[in-house]
């Protein structure tokens, strides 16, 4: 019986490389998968899942008007699993489409992404994944500044100063965001 999985973690917790590992495991057994990623993620190139260790793979980009269910249903070869990177950028409608893939097409769906933004607010996609997922798993990483578990994401400006207000979505990597614990989110030991 297929299920909807949500695997979340702070920045740098290995979400993208986990997608590539899962895809490889299926494909080694001659079981095709379908990989999607947000069309908003332009850090590397639109339509790619890229990990910080240098591995990358083509993926179907999701835009606001993308109907993920229709795309999967129209595939000539049914995938054994659907993998979604950057699930936090999805809309409620997208998440409902993922649930429909599981419930109607009986295909497992694994969504990977951030749970909360730099203000410690839920992303829309993450909120609805938390509500609709059958299984939820935290992917752990350590705080950039201390030894505690990172549960938040700290955004910094060009001078390295922490930012706590602004637009929720700003695409960036290690130069813009740090995985941090709660204490270091409030009082980051940054030298400016």
UniProtKB/Swiss-Prot annotation:
Instruction: Cite the EC number.
Output: 2.7.1.21
List the Gene Ontology MF annotations in alphabetical order. Answer: ATP binding; thymidine kinase activity; zinc ion binding
Per UniProt, Zn(2+) binds at: 143, 146, 181, 184
Q: Name one GO biological process term.
A: thymidine metabolic process
Record SUPFAM superfamilies: Glucocorticoid receptor-like (DNA-binding domain), P-loop containing nucleoside triphosphate hydrolases
Q: Which cellular component, as a GO term, is one annotated location? A: cytosol
> PANTHER family this protein is in?
THYMIDINE KINASE (PTHR11441), THYMIDINE KINASE, CYTOSOLIC (PTHR11441:SF0)
In the record, the note on similarity to other proteins reads:
Belongs to the thymidine kinase family.
Q: What protein is this chain from?
A: Thymidine kinase
From what organism does this protein derive? Shouchella clausii (strain KSM-K16) (Alkalihalobacillus clausii)
Gene responsible for this protein: tdk
């Amino acid at each position: 019986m297929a299920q909807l999985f949500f695997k979340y973690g702070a920045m740098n917790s290995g979400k993208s490389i986990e997608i590539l590992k899962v895809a490889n495991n299926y494909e080694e057994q001659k079981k095709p998968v379908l990989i999607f990623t947000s069309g908003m993620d332009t850090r590397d190139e639109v339509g790619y899942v890229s990990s910080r260790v240098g591995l990358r793979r083509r993926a179907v980009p999701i835009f606001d008007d993308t109907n993920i269910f229709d795309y999967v249903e129209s595939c000539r070869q049914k995938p054994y699993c659907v993998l979604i990177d950057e699930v936090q950028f999805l809309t409620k409608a997208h998440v409902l489409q993922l649930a429909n893939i599981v419930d109607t097409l009986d295909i497992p769906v694994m969504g990977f992404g951030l749970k909360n933004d730099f203000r410690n607010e839920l992303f829309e996609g993450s909120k609805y994944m938390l509500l609709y997922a059958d299984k939820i798993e935290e992917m752990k990483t350590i705080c950039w500044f201390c030894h505690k578990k990172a549960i938040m994401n700290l955004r910094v400006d060009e001078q390295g100063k922490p930012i706590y207000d602004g637009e929720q979505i700003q695409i960036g990597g290690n130069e813009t965001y740090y995985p941090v614990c709660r204490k270091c989110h409030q009082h980051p030991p940054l030298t400016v």
